[in-house]
Regions:
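N-terminal cysteine/histidine-rich coordination modules
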Residues: 1-75
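Short, well-structured alpha-helical interface segments that form or flank functional binding sites
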Residues: 48-51, 111-112, 147-148
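Extended interfacial segments that mediate partner engagement and assembly in macromolecular machines
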Residues: 63-143
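Short, intrinsically disordered terminal segments enriched in charged and Pro/Gly residues
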Residues: 77-96, 179-182, 211-227, 236
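Alpha-helical linker/edge segments of TPR/alpha-solenoid repeat scaffolds
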Residues: 123-125, 156-167, 187-226, 232-236
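Boundary/linker segments of alpha-helical solenoid repeat arrays
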Residues: 140-149, 174-189, 213-220
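TPR/TPR-like (Sel1-like) alpha-helical repeat modules
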Residues: 161-179
Length: 236
């Protein structure tokens, strides 16, 4: 019998089975990639980011908060068919992406598909990595915010979709960008021009400042889309 005040065991929001608590990754110590995949030690914990219910097969970072709409997705034939159609290492992310699409969260589904692409990177599966990046870019559509627009350009470039990446970069160049975002965009355009599909760190596009900025500069940096990423991670 559970004593009063004792923590309750987490349960799957779809079927009610006991499930593990959400994974808590360590803070990154290395700069992120241009698509914002975090650096180490967070990077290597990717396989732990999504939990899968042993009873019903639902997948999510936190199984306890799955919405009611997830039940219909998890019980659908298309969801069950994922197991035989895709490599095991990517299934948690693909399942989570399908649940998010089924509940109308396209932006969340794009993130899940990008994570599937990261898992393919780690498995040296370049075909699926490109395929799932292209799907992430499609799900994002035309992002309203600059950060996602920059990430989408990187995703398209790494998928080998150079024409689409060029068009997206041209559109973003017409918007008002802070200094860091403009530097990242220029770096991306140079990589696209050379048909580079490789991984690059943000620190390669925008080296961190060599000295501690004046307080006014630090205040401006709070509004800087990507500059905040250099406060903690050290360069690789």
């Amino acid at each position: 019998m559970t004593s009063p005040g004792a923590p309750t065991e987490p349960h799957c929001g779809v079927c009610g089975a006991a499930c593990p608590p959400p994974f808590r990754a360590p803070a990154p110590e290395i700069a992120p990639d241009l698509d914002l995949r975090p650096g180490e030690p967070t990077r290597s914990t990717l396989p732990d980011w999504i939990a899968t219910c042993r009873r019903c097969g639902a997948a999510a970072p936190d199984l306890t908060v799955l919405p009611p709409e997830a039940l219909a997705v998890v019980e659908a034939d298309a969801y069950r068919a994922l197991s035989g159609a895709h490599p095991e290492f990517a299934l948690p992310f693909l399942r989570w992406a399908m649940i998010l699409r089924g509940t109308g969260d396209r932006a969340g589904a794009a993130e899940a598909m990008l994570q599937a692409a990261w898992s393919a990177d780690d498995a040296a599966d370049s075909i699926n990595a490109a395929r799932w990046r292209a799907e992430a870019a499609f799900l994002w559509g035309e992002p309203a915010d600059v950060e996602t627009a920059l990430r989408r350009i990187d995703v398209l470039r790494r998928a080998g979709e150079f024409d689409a990446a060029t068009a997206a970069a041209d559109r973003l160049a017409g918007r008002a960008l802070d200094q860091t975002s403009a530097s990242v965009l220029a770096f991306q355009r140079a990589r696209i021009a050379t048909r580079d599909i490789g991984r690059h760190l943000i620190s390669s596009a925008v080296p961190p400042p060599a000295h501690r900025p004046h307080v006014a500069a630090r205040q401006r940096d709070r509004r800087d889309v990507l500059g905040r990423l250099f406060r903690n991670p050290r360069r690789e």
